[in-house]
Design a protein with these regions (language model features):
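Bacterial N-terminal signal peptides that target proteins for export
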Residues: 1-8
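Residue-level signal for mature regions of secreted extracellular proteins and peptides
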Residues: 11-12, 63
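Noncatalytic, solvent-exposed loop/strand surfaces
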Residues: 19-23, 31, 42, 55, ...
Length: 408
């Protein structure tokens, strides 16, 4: 199959939301420019990469950029990150570069309606013409939260961290801004001019916003926006993983689901929640605080949720308790739907797992597992349905998931 995989591999400075002794450092307060590359070469069968860091952001585009859309992390709610007729990654050249932005970028750029949109940790949102790089609009959504106001963390300040999402049907950009004095606002912006359509608080009920971090990419399904939360770098305070959803027009009551753990269990993978063709929502859960190996605490797991956020099913590896003790959790990378009703997931331990989406299998109930990454998997993965390009710490690694679910 001809095509290009786009995999976001987060550097060690960007993946510390679930606390690792070997992962540290936050970005500087000054922001990077945006660079956009294009090519006139034909499509290639090799895998391409797109990396976002505090130093640089690059988006690969086709020769007709006005027609390109990349609506969220991995392009769509299934996070596949696969472009069937994309450019040759080996023949890219820089087309334009923006002026310096006002803060660090942790989320992927999104592309829709001839615009490239990015959001910074200073709560600024910028839109550029995708063909020329000319600024289209810029809006600031409020003062961000300084590191000094938080018990722990490694982003200073914290504003917009998770990748936004676009509803192409209404040309609306959705993102979450962390604003003073300590509140997460879901903001809906007009893609054409940056005007605010509406904004509402989406802090998980009963949890302290100053201990929750909105790092995961936003998701749209079932006419709702889904927002996931984990903890700060250092795992301080009484945080728990959570999901909150709101209707696309901001109306009605929010729906929510909180990981049923005593503490922790963050949903911190930058790739965010994944949605399958059934409409079910899949989440990967990081370490939870358990002291009893015989009492599963819903940490180091993949959960299947209905669109109304009712929990249906869960899976965890047989060594879930050991993974928690070694801070080698699954939360570092999100679930990835494959063809045939399967789910691929990996984590800090570098092991890849294939699950049955319709029956996750409980503890140790995966269809297959294999060592995939040296140094762990972080960020996100991409797939054409069977070949999976995993965002490993040392660089993208491609594996094949066979008809028997085995990984090779």
């Amino acid at each position: 199959m001809r095509g290009v995989w786009v995999v976001m591999v987060m550097s060690s400075a960007l993946v510390a939301a679930c606390s690792s002794a070997t992962v540290s450092a936050g970005p500087s307060s000054s922001g990077p420019p945006i660079a956009v590359s294009t090519t006139t070469a034909p499509s290639a069968t090799s895998a391409g990469t797109s990396s976002t860091s505090a130093a640089n952001t690059t988006t690969s585009l086709s020769t007709t950029p006005a027609d390109v859309s990349w609506l969220t992390f991995g392009s769509s709610a299934d996070r596949r990150g696969f472009v069937a007729s994309g450019p040759n990654p080996g023949a890219l050249s820089q087309k334009w570069i923006s002026d310096e932005l006002d803060g660090a970028l942790y989320g992927e750029p999104i592309v829709s309606g001839g615009r490239v949109v990015v959001a910074t940790e200073h709560n600024s949102v910028y839109a550029f013409d995708v063909a020329t790089g000319r600024p289209a609009w810029h809006v600031n959504l409020g003062d961000p939260i300084p590191r000094s106001a938080l018990e722990c963390g490694n982003i200073d300040p914290t504003g917009v961290t998770g990748t936004p999402v676009v509803d192409a049907g209404t040309d609306t950009v959705y993102l979450v801004a962390f604003v003073q004095p300590g509140r997460h606002d879901l903001v809906a912006l007009n893609l054409s001019d940056g005007s605010v359509r509406w904004r509402r608080s989406v802090d998980p009920p009963g949890l302290d916003p100053l201990h929750e971090q909105q790092r995961a990419a936003l998701t749209i399904t079932n006419e709702r926006v889904y927002v996931a939360y984990g903890g700060l770098f250092g795992d301080c305070g009484p945080y728990k993983g959570a999901v909150v959803s709101l209707a696309l027009d901001g109306s009605g009551d929010p729906q929510s689901w909180i990981v049923p753990a005593t503490r922790e269990g963050g949903l911190w993978a930058p790739s965010g929640l994944a949605v399958t063709s059934t409409g079910d929502v899949f989440v990967s859960i990081g370490n939870a605080e358990s002291t009893d190996p015989n009492n599963f605490d819903d940490g180091n797991a993949v959960a299947r949720l209905r669109p109304d956020l009712s929990a249906v099913d869960v899976w965890a590896p047989a060594d879930w308790y050991s993974l928690s003790g070694r801070d080698a959790d699954l939360g570092s990378i999100g679930p990835l739907p494959l063809d045939g009703g399967r789910i691929f997931v990996a984590g800090k331990n570098g092991v890849g797992y294939v699950l049955d989406a319709a029956h996750l299998g409980g503890i140790g109930g995966e269809l297959a597992n294999a060592d995939v990454c040296d140094g762990g998997a972080f960020g996100g993965s991409a797939t054409d349905g069977s070949i999976v390009v995993v965002g490993c710490r040392g660089g993208p690694v491609g594996v094949q998931v066979g008809a028997d679910a085995k990984i090779s």
